[in-house]
Amino acid sequence: MSGRLKIVVMLGGPSAEREVSLRSGAGVVKALRSLGHTVVELDPKTPDWILPPDTEVVCLAPLHGTYGEDGTVQRQLEKLGVLFTGCDSEASRIAFDKVLTKQKCIESGVPTTKFVVVNSEKTPLPKNLQLPLVVKPVRQGSSVGLQFVERAEDWQNALAEALKFDSEVLVEEKIVGRETTVGILDGVALPVLEICPKAGGFDYRNKYTAGCTEYFCPAEFDAATTQRIQAAALGAFHAIGGRDYARVDVMVRANGGPVVLEVNTLPGMTETSLLPKAAAAAGLSYEELCQQMIDLALKRKQAAKERKEHKKETASVAFA
């Protein structure tokens, strides 16, 4: 859809996921340059960043964590009137807050886990939830601060560790089943990807340490179960008001019932990350995935222009 463009790729940033973001950014920059675009790297580690003149589109794909995923940078770019890839500021804000995401899922009838919110290390083990539990910061990504509570005596340590990363933590029942994730691209669910850690859960270590986790895409589910998983993922994506692309984490119970865990509006973009794996299973190379993210932003810009022109034409006819 696009010719050669001047693209600013934001990467790094001030969050706890800075190193992951830099790794994602290196891949995106390389891919876009290989496609002939002029690419400028911008690290918004301080709030006084300035966009280069003549920037045509800002690619936010690699900017993970607080500031990148919580709607802050999207809000700044919206105020500047600058075109950028991915979800808008409101959808980003909702998705980054795991509690808001669950509330939106519940309102939309999307299956999700039973949960409580805790803000103190002194909080006793919730009586309305059954062990094992998952404890995680309300506003973090990349499994930062994620803890598993298998026994009651693990509770206080898990809570204290998760509270290091946010003032509130989400406590939810650990779903027994198969762990999957579903990429969403231009309103279409990509092939389901199954995540199989060799030991423990899909925490920060297993996510970013080579050889700790196996991935299967497309996952081996029957057609009906696959459709249910993809439908739940799309439901969550629409519930938060998503656009362009995202990745939705879904647990699958033994009976095939999907349970949405969270929505990632800026998922990992290293060449071995999960969204690129799912795109590859759908026949898209890493470079094609990066290009489609740019094209989706340009498509939105063109649609907005056409709506504006149509509105002017309608007004002209009305006053003729």
Regions found by a protein language model. Name each.
Residues L5, G109, D222-A320:
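ATP-dependent carboxylate activation and anion-phosphoryl transfer catalytic cores
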Residues M1-L11, V39, L51-D54, I94-R178:
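Active-site nucleotide/adenylate-binding loops and adjacent lid/helix of ATP-dependent enzymes
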Residues E150-A231, V252-V259:
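Phosphate-binding site of ATP-dependent enzymes
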Residues G3-M10, T209-A219, L274:
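A short small-residue
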Residues M1-F96, L100, E107, N119-P126, ...:
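ATP-binding N-terminal substructure of ATP-dependent carboxylate-amine bond-forming enzymes
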Residues T72-E78, G201-T209, T265:
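Short, flexible, mixed-charge acidic loops at enzyme active sites
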